[in-house]
């Protein structure tokens, strides 16, 4: 912890991407920038170079209380704001984000390490689209009327929960914040949001850009360690819901916290997603086969730091040798390096600690008897990038009972094995504690459909992978989570239903 601003900091503009940052960022509470109550800040390093990016508020319980005070002060006013006005504000937020797309994308790259080509073409545009989508959904949402009898009617109303807590992961900081904020705000809730300690920057810049569009207190952002303020927020009796994206282990704790106050939770947790390639993908040397090869290589998307990372590849035995020759060649052609270079396809891991975790898992795989087919080493770059957190995309061959097949690594490490029949592929796919995502690749529509229905996962991509449209439901089976994010059904996760049962009859029941 430090109390003084840094005397010098890295200048992102040196790489040709202008990004003017403040030396220090506070919390956003009640529509204002508020210094942490204890006056402490932590150093936020960029994974691009391993150097200081900025300092960020290191908050405590008093800061969460201030945010909750601000949210409760305005919650009734925001809840009674018309859906037309709430939707209009969400559209304005999306427009402001679009006007500042390059700024947000560049900040996300510096803070997280992912390539600028991803943040500018995927992360930020998707975040923008989610605000527009839920602005549209809330305008289209209707209540319901049930006629009990000719003189009795049940009216059903959607009402906001009140003040909700949201805890954001470090792998998609801005997108995950948008996934949670957009439906919560559309439904009429106020938000206390905690960004990940490793990647707070893009959300803070977002509030600089759009904070004036919202009534003070509707959105509050408090920075700091999850073990301190995340736990305090999740256990607070002053929130009506908690939404969390992160590891299964922490998700279990969040769920226990929520039970203390009997509040609903949305949990999007870990995964070990199978990506299944049937023999017919090689029937033709065509665009579909090329697409399948790209689908295989997508384990390296976002440096493998994705809950739905296709980190297990199941390849039909009859094509294994031929398929893997082409697949390895495709993976080895991935351009990794400086995330701020627009041709870079794979950037830096988010932190030195995460880099070490991934390398440790590669060692575990070797000790278990897995063969390293490519990669497996830290990638050393030159110049100002020499202290960045870079890794070679890695493919291991082994058996599904190995730890590298069963445990979430959260890095660009793919565990590959083979299967003979559809039944064996299905058994291997479901042999995991997780059930967040899966991929199926086949030219046979009937086969792909049967596999998709049989796989125990909340989303099964068929002849595609890593698409996250706003109007497609996302969430996990088994230990991958509870509830769904995205899609209009998400509105109901931030609402409660009131039934107003009205009798228009003058006649008594006649019971007493």
Curated annotation (Swiss-Prot):
The UniProt induction remark is: Is repressed by Fis. Positively regulated by RpoS and Crp. Induced by ethanol. Expression is maximally induced during the transition from exponential phase to stationary phase.
Which PROSITE patterns would you find in this protein's record?
Answer: ALDEHYDE_DEHYDR_CYS (PS00070), ALDEHYDE_DEHYDR_GLU (PS00687)
Pfam annotation, one family: Aldedh
Sorted alphabetically, the keyword list is: Magnesium, NADP, Oxidoreductase
Catalytically driven reaction(s): an aldehyde + NADP(+) + H2O = a carboxylate + NADPH + 2 H(+); acetaldehyde + NADP(+) + H2O = acetate + NADPH + 2 H(+); chloroacetaldehyde + NADP(+) + H2O = chloroacetate + NADPH + 2 H(+); propanal + NADP(+) + H2O = propanoate + NADPH + 2 H(+)
A single Gene Ontology biological process assigned to it is: response to ethanol
What the entry lists under SUPFAM superfamilies is as follows: ALDH-like (SSF53720)
Query: What are its E.C. numbers?
Result: 1.2.1.4
What are the recorded GO MF terms, alphabetically?
A: acetaldehyde dehydrogenase (NADP+) activity; aldehyde dehydrogenase (NAD+) activity; oxidoreductase activity
What positions constitute the catalytic site? 268, 307
Q: How does it assemble?
A: Homotetramer.
Supply the PANTHER family for this chain.
ALDEHYDE DEHYDROGENASE B-RELATED
Query: Any idea what job this protein has?
Result: Catalyzes the NADP(+)-dependent oxidation of diverse aldehydes to their corresponding carboxylic acids, with a preference for acetaldehyde and chloroacetaldehyde. May play a role in detoxifying aldehydes present during stationary phase. Cannot use NAD(+) instead of NADP(+) as the electron acceptor. To a lesser extent is also able to oxidize propionaldehyde (propanal), benzaldehyde, mafosfamide, and 4-hydroperoxycyclophosphamide. Does not use either glyceraldehyde or glycolaldehyde as substrates.
Specify the protein name.
Answer: Aldehyde dehydrogenase B
Annotated organism of origin: Escherichia coli (strain K12)
